[in-house]
């Protein structure tokens, strides 16, 4: 949706929510190409995508969601009117796809992002792993509840980490776990020669324009491809479970069980650049998933470790995907 900024898409989403939510039982609104018969519709390269709990017949649907919608935006001091075609996406059962954790070792968390930072009192880099917040008990309180966390490695291997922080009101689903480089290598999660140069991260503005871009994820160390379906500026689909999440990518056209239980926290590469962290999937086939902006999660994690340790400027960076 290159024609509109991310802020404009938020405004459009909010306006259309107010207009249609009650009369059409709208679950959410995103932006992407129209799809017909499981293929992209060339007549609708850019659409307003209405998420509904159950699709109606075409005739009945048009009474509630018209083929096109009009809206107004202020540009250069003047109000302008725009019109876009619509698409309807039926929401099946939505599942948070992380494995719930217990501090007694009842589960293992999946992580897809490794970061490093330097604390002033240290001569070495500290390593951290980023995953989802919903893997941990809702009653969790920090710092008194910090404990050793078991993290899934390659095969049957496991390593321990210390939970440093979880997102709360940040409109994210994220947590940060401190780990040791030696343990990452011993658990076959990381190569001994792994470097610490910072890697590129896809921006929210780029995610906004990624409709139909190809993506790659590695749940359980197996490469799985997908295609970007929509960009959702403020995602309400999982509001009852974890609250609203900002800047969400909806992925589809993946193999069965790609986004199933236990795969939350997996990193998504979109157009060959790391762009999102998975937090949910659509049951029962789990061929569709939902990921949050890696850029926003990284900003939260950087601010968190700086508040905790007063890290050296520019030392926090994303260095590896796992």
Each PLM stretch: what is its role?
Residues 1-122, 127, 163-164, 318:
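Noncatalytic regulatory segments and standalone regulatory/sensor domains
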Residues 26, 45, 195-203, 278:
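A broad structural signal for short, well-ordered beta-strand segments within beta-sheet-rich domains
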Residues 30, 159-165, 276, 280:
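A structural microfeature
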Residues 58-74, 188-199, 292-298:
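Surface-exposed flexible segments
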Residues 97-252, 256, 269-270:
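Serine endopeptidase catalytic core focused on the charge-relay Asp
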Residues 251, 269-322:
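C-terminal subregion of chymotrypsin/trypsin-like serine protease catalytic domains
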Residues 260-264:
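Short, small/polar residue-rich loop motifs at catalytic or cofactor-binding pockets
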């Amino acid at each position: 949706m290159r024609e509109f900024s991310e802020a404009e898409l938020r405004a459009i989403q909010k306006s259309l929510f107010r207009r249609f939510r009650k009369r059409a039982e709208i679950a959410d609104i995103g932006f992407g190409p129209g799809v017909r018969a499981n293929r992209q519709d060339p007549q609708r390269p850019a659409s307003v995508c209405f998420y509904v709990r159950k699709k109606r017949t075409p005739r009945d649907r048009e009474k509630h969601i018209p083929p096109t919608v009009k809206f107004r935006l202020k540009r250069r001091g003047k109000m302008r009117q725009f019109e876009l075609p619509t698409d309807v996406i039926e929401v099946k059962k939505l599942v948070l796809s992380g494995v719930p954790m217990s501090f007694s070792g009842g589960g293992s968390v999946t992580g897809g992002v490794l970061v490093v930072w330097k604390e002033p009192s240290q001569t070495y880099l500290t390593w951290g792993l980023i995953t989802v917040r919903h893997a941990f008990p809702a009653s969790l309180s920090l710092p008194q509840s910090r404990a050793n966390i078991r993290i899934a490695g390659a095969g049957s291997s496991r390593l321990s980490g210390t939970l440093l922080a979880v997102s709360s009101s940040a409109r994210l689903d994220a947590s940060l776990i401190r780990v040791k480089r030696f343990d990452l290598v011993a658990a076959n999660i990381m190569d001994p020669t792994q470097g610490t140069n910072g890697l590129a991260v896809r921006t929210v503005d780029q995610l906004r324009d990624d409709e139909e871009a190809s993506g790659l994820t590695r749940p359980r160390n197996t490469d799985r491809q997908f295609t970007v379906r929509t960009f959702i500026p403020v995602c309400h689909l999982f509001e009852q479970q974890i609250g609203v999440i900002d800047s969400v990518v909806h992925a589809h056209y993946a193999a069965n069980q790609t986004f199933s239980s236990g795969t939350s926290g997996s990193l998504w590469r979109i157009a060959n650049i790391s762009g999102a962290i998975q937090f949910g999937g659509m049951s029962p086939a789990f061929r569709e998933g939902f990921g949050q902006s890696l850029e926003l999660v990284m900003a939260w994690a950087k601010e968190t470790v700086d508040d905790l340790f007063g890290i050296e400027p520019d030392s926090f960076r994303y260095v590896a995907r796992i």
